[in-house]
């Protein structure tokens, strides 16, 4: 930890060379010095070397200080050099600008280099001005004629809708798959082509009539009318014949 600063007055303690003392061990009665255990071998074990002299501590120049004095000196050094004890500390100059240390600059450079090229490319792309969205003519809702509400006199007739080529192409695709649209699909098509639901409905009605005409199919409306007229004629003819038969009888 860099926050802990060692005092310059601290002297490393000096100790004498380490020597093993076996005097206490022999007094306690070790395994080899016990005559009772080694009696079967013809006598106790006698040490060849004399025991070493007792340890006498030497006087050294090191005088241990109290913990409070050491903490006090550390606090004074931290107050004099705050940047050494706190790496992230930034000194503020008189002008108000912060001075960044070399470690902070290296950290910022590493973070910029660590980014992948894809992330850097995205940042650059977001910074540029976005290109304007292209609006094609068929996307503009200008095909519906507006009726002037302040027009004097009777209400004018509804004007025809001028469908664009793109709208007609999309409607033809829908008609190719299904000649009858559901309500949900009709709303989706109207929203996609910037049309009203009624305009899509009318276009499909007209397209079905043209399709029947091209395939020479009888008109359902005309056939129902003709059926009604034929039924009425048959009824009238049947009533006339019954009246004639009654007169002849």
Curated annotation (Swiss-Prot):
- Write out the annotated subcellular location: Nucleus
Q: Which SMART domains match?
A: HOX (SM00389)
GO cellular component term of the entry, any: nucleoplasm
Broad class of where this protein is predominantly found: nucleus
Which SUPFAM superfamilies has this protein been placed in?
Answer: Homeodomain-like
Under the heading PROSITE patterns, the entry gives: ANTENNAPEDIA (PS00032), HOMEOBOX_1 (PS00027), HOMEOBOX_2 (PS50071)
Function (record text): Sequence-specific transcription factor which is part of a developmental regulatory system that provides cells with specific positional identities on the anterior-posterior axis.
Which stretch carries the motif Antp-type hexapeptide?
Answer: 135-140
Residue stretches spanning the membrane: none
The name under which this protein is listed is Homeobox protein Hox-D4b
> Bias regions of kind Polar residues — which residues?
23-37
Q: Which cysteines are joined by disulfide bonds?
A: none
GO-annotated molecular function? DNA-binding transcription factor activity, RNA polymerase II-specific; RNA polymerase II cis-regulatory region sequence-specific DNA binding
DNA-binding region(s) from the entry: 156-215
The UniProt gene name for this protein comes to hoxd4b
- Bias (Basic and acidic residues) occurs at 66-80
Which species does this protein come from?
Takifugu rubripes (Japanese pufferfish)
The processes (GO biological process) annotated in the record are: anterior/posterior pattern specification; embryonic skeletal system morphogenesis; positive regulation of transcription by RNA polymerase II
Q: Which residues form a coiled coil?
A: none
